[in-house]
């Protein structure tokens, strides 16, 4: 057995199964396509589910992949053990109704013993208790010693998840050390002790489990295998930890160098090194697949991993941002297998650095607040942080709840997770309701997936806007029906259609369906997961029946407006590359009849000059009346021709290339104008940020662009009338008016400051003493924040040793300020804690340092009550 690098093992596996007639497919994105049950791809077979279920036809009946995967279920163990990680690669070979046990078992043995040259006396095989077929194949079709085959029960060697396809499995195991194992009991014990490790699982999907728990044989059984690449590498490299594998150790070594720490000398520091090593691998691949940090979904997983790694960097004493530097080692070691890593290297680094900077801005403030919470709990003798406070850390300071847990765990404090969940649910309620409203399919999707896969629709919409078609399926609610009557709403599938179904960022067509004594409104057109084109209809007159021949007509004016926006999006994409930079890539888009929206990767807002030049270049190309050509070709031919493809998109072997002269060439299935002149006019209406490193441009074309300009002109004319000036003088006139207003406001504020200063003597008459600390407090009216702070500052200087707490009410709100001398702070006074509690009485919040704090409130009528509470709060703080 020779030492093999991780990359070498991957290539050996894929080459081996290509030699057995398998199609080598590139890893799918970590972002699941059309699978709401998964947040991230977590297994090699996960993206292939539609092929196993028959919803989609696989490109070949034999497939082999190396799939990148993310699992965060055991994240708390990452770093603490030698084998836990959130990112891993899963090698697999799959059969969709092609070969079965007779082929896969000998192939597996051949690869392990001949390609990898693993000694046979180091190997063991387990099979399902009753799987005599597998036993016979192992003993008759391979040269394994039968005494090395053990039969195990359902919990170990039978794969099933509820109802549906399932079956027995056979696993191959490697013994690191020790004498030959002679019994099942000894095998199980040595497996539990990690002396024996499983590295390849062969799943024989041969049954379909029904609702009565009957196991019915499948007519076409499948094969699904999985070999963890990192685990296999530990075997081939003779190491005991995934963190010692060549490509992963390179990442760990880089972190060690940055931290100036030697791995293996300190247990706690080793944990941090392993956490960062694993997490930086995960985030590098996640960002390369288009995931961006956010506070929900997979973006939250990314943010959590980044911030957890960043915090462990702080524990190692690393100053400043560093994760973005480490990712280059991940890329260097993996880019040959995953080309997108090298292509997106600068983008990945920028996103990581931006998130590190954001976390650095919030972590210190968040930890300060968390420490205050901890102090409060300790003072009260409590050991559980309330859920609402944990949620505030999450919502306000960007602290993942898991990070709060980790920090508190170090202090032996728990979290009220129920309370946190309650707060989270309250925040998500409206968003959840909105998502439910947009769930256009619901349970109908299940019904449609049961239709024969060959029941497909021919799309004729590139050249036709009206066709005669036959209705081949009708869905109403959750049922397949024969007829829809007047007033009914439902879904129909036809044998051919001119209607474009929503995909690729382009909205679906609308229009009408007509027949004898029937009128139907087609409200939308979409695809389901199996590729069926669904027409969402409302019957206005008459009825439609299965097998009826009808006429379908697309709304021409709406389609024309959509085409203009889609073609303009292609021009915009290329213009951004030329004006802003070649690094620009599409991160998302949407076009309908009203406007276009284009998301792209960039790290700052565009300047006015850049926006002007981009808009000018797009309009220049419109005026050149560039012909638009489409051509269907092989995917590799398309890429070689320079056609732009989305980096996280999976394409069929045949693709459609849309070209606007020599200016733009993209893979696109959408509808377009015949020449750029048809777009008419393009106008950018906004440029904003939508996520870290992602910008969004919205624009309009044609008559919508003209309407936008007319509205702007009308607004300009209205301003000129109000300011009583001409168009050319409007800026000077507005500037002088603003300056005049500022001067008046300054005069008013000066008068208020004088008024506030005149109140000093009245306030000082109410001076009190609390446990040796002078206390000055009071409520004022209509004093702005600046004047209130100035007054508090002067009062503090006058009393020389003590605390000042003031409130000002006006315009339906209240402002608080507190200032304390050094002597008062030394005795226990804390402005931040005092002001926080005082503001809460008035329906507000805030905080600050021990010597100075400020806050706001919504209930000015509570001002006197809040200020009256200061004495008690101060008394409780001073010991």
Swiss-Prot record:
Its EC number is 6.1.1.7. One of its GO terms (molecular function) is zinc ion binding. One of its GO terms (cellular component) is cytosol. The keyword Cytoplasm applies. Disulfide bonds: none annotated. Its cofactor is Zn(2+). Zn(2+) binds at residues 566, 570, 668, 672. One of its GO terms (biological process) is alanyl-tRNA aminoacylation. Binds 1 zinc ion per subunit. It catalyses: tRNA(Ala) + L-alanine + ATP = L-alanyl-tRNA(Ala) + AMP + diphosphate. Pfam families: DHHA1, tRNA-synt_2c, tRNA_SAD. Keywords: Aminoacyl-tRNA synthetase, ATP-binding, Cytoplasm, Ligase, Metal-binding, Nucleotide-binding, Protein biosynthesis, RNA-binding, tRNA-binding, Zinc. It comes from the Bacteria. The keyword Manganese does not apply. It is found in: Cytoplasm. Catalyzes the attachment of alanine to tRNA(Ala) in a two-step reaction: alanine is first activated by ATP to form Ala-AMP and then transferred to the acceptor end of tRNA(Ala). Also edits incorrectly charged Ser-tRNA(Ala) and Gly-tRNA(Ala) via its editing domain. Belongs to the class-II aminoacyl-tRNA synthetase family. Consists of three domains; the N-terminal catalytic domain, the editing domain and the C-terminal C-Ala domain. The editing domain removes incorrectly charged amino acids, while the C-Ala domain, along with tRNA(Ala), serves as a bridge to cooperatively bring together the editing and aminoacylation centers thus stimulating deacylation of misacylated tRNAs. This is Alanine--tRNA ligase. It comes from Clostridium tetani (strain Massachusetts / E88).
């Amino acid at each position: 057995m020779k030492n093999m690098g991780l990359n070498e093992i991957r290539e050996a596996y894929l080459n081996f199964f290509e030699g057995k007639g398998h199609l080598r497919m590139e890893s799918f994105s970590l972002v699941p396509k059309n699978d709401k049950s998964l947040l991230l791809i977590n297994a090699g077979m996960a993206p292939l589910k539609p092929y196993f279920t028959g919803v989609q036809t696989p490109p070949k009946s034999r497939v082999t992949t190396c799939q990148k995967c993310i699992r965060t279920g055991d994240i708390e163990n990452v770093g603490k053990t030698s084998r836990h990680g959130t990112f891993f690669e899963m090698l697999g070979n799959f059969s969709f109704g092609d070969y079965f046990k007779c082929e896969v078992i000998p192939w597996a043995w051949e690869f392990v013993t001949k390609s990898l040259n693993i000694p046979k006396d180091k190997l063991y095989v387990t099979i399902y208790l009753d799987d005599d077929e597998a036993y016979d194949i192992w003993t008759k079709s391979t040269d394994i010693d039968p005494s090395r085959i053990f039969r195990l029960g359902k919990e170990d060697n039978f794969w099933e998840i509820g109802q549906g396809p399932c079956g027995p499995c056979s696993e191959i195991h490697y013994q690191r050390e020790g004498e030959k194992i002679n019994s099942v009991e000894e095998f199980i014990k040595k497996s539990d002790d990690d002396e024996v490790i499983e590295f390849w699982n062969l799943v024989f999907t041969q049954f379909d489990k029904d609702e009565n728990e009957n196991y019915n044989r499948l007519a076409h059984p499948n094969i699904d295998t999985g070999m963890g690449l990192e685990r296999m590498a530990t075997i081939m490299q003779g190491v005991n930890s995934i963190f010692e594998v060549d490509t992963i150790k390179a990442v760990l070594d880089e972190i060690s160098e940055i931290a100036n720490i030697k791995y293996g000398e300190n247990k706690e520091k080793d944990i941090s090194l392993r956490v960062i090593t694993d997490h930086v691998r995960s985030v590098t691949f996640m960002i390369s697949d288009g995931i961006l940090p956010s506070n929900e979904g997979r973006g939250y997983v990314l943010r959590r991993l980044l911030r957890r790694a960043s915090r462990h960097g702080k524990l190692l004493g690393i100053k400043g941002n560093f994760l973005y530097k480490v990712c280059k080692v991940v890329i260097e070691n993996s880019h040959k297998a995953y080309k997108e890593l090298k292509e997106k290297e600068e983008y990945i680094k920028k996103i990581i650095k931006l998130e590190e900077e954001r976390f650095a801005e919030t972590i210190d403030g968040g930890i300060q607040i968390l420490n205050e919470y901890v102090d409060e709990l300790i003072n009260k003798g409590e050991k559980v942080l309330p859920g609402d406070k944990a949620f505030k850390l999450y919502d306000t300071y960007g602290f993942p709840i898991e990070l709060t847990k980790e920090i508190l765990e170090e202090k032996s404090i728990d979290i009220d997770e129920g309370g946190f969940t309650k707060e989270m649910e309250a925040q998500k309620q409206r968003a959840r309701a909105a998502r439910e409203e947009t769930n256009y399919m619901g349970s109908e999707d299940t019904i449609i997936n049961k239709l024969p896969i060959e029941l497909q629709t021919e799309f004729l919409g590139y050249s036709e806007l009206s066709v005669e078609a036959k209705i081949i399926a009708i869905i109403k609610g959750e049922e397949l029906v024969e007829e829809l009557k007047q007033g009914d709403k439902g879904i129909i599938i036809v044998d051919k259609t001119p209607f474009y179904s929503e995909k690729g960022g382009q909205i679906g067509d609308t229009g009408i369906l007509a027949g004898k004594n029937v009128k139907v409104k087609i409200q939308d057109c979409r695809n389901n997961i199996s590729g069926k084109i669904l027409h969402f209809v409302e019957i206005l007159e008459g009825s439609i029946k299965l097998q009826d021949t009808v006429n379908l007509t697309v709304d021409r004016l709406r389609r024309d407006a959509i085409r203009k926006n889609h073609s303009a999006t292609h021009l915009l994409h290329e213009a951004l590359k030329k004006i802003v930079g070649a690094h620009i890539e599409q991160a998302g888009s949407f076009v309908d009849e009203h406007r276009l929206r284009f998301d792209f990767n960039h790290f700052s807002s565009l300047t006015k000059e850049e926006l002007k030049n981009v808009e000018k270049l797009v309009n220049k190309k419109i005026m050149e009346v560039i012909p638009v050509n489409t051509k269907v070709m092989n995917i590799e031919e398309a890429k070689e021709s320079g056609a732009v493809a989305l980096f996280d998109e999976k394409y069929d072997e045949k693709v459609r290339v849309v070209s606007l002269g020599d200016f733009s060439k993209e893979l696109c299935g959408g509808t377009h104008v015949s020449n750029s002149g048809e777009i008419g006019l393009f106008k950018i209406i906004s440029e904003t940020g939508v996520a870290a490193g992602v910008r969004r441009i919205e624009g309009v074309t044609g008559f919508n662009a003209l309407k936008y300009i007319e509205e702007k002109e009308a607004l300009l004319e209205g301003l000129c009338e109000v300011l009583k000036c001409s168009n050319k003088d409007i800026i000077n006139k507005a500037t002088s008016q603003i300056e005049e207003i500022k001067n008046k406001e300054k005069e008013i504020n000066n008068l208020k400051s004088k008024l506030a200063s005149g109140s000093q003597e009245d306030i000082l008459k109410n001076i009190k003493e609390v446990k040796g600390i002078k206390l000055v407090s009071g409520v004022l009216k209509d004093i702005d924040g600046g004047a209130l702070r100035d007054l508090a500052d002067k009062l503090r200087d006058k009393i020389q040793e003590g605390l000042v707490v003031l409130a000002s009410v006006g315009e339906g709100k209240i402002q608080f300020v507190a200032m304390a001398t050094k002597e008062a702070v030394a005795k226990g006074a804390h402005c931040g804690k005092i002001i926080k509690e005082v503001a809460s009485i008035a329906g507000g919040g805030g905080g600050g340092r021990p010597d100075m704090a400020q806050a706001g409130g919504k209930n000015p009528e509570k001002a006197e009550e809040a200020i009256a509470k200061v004495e008690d709060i101060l008394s409780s703080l001073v010991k």
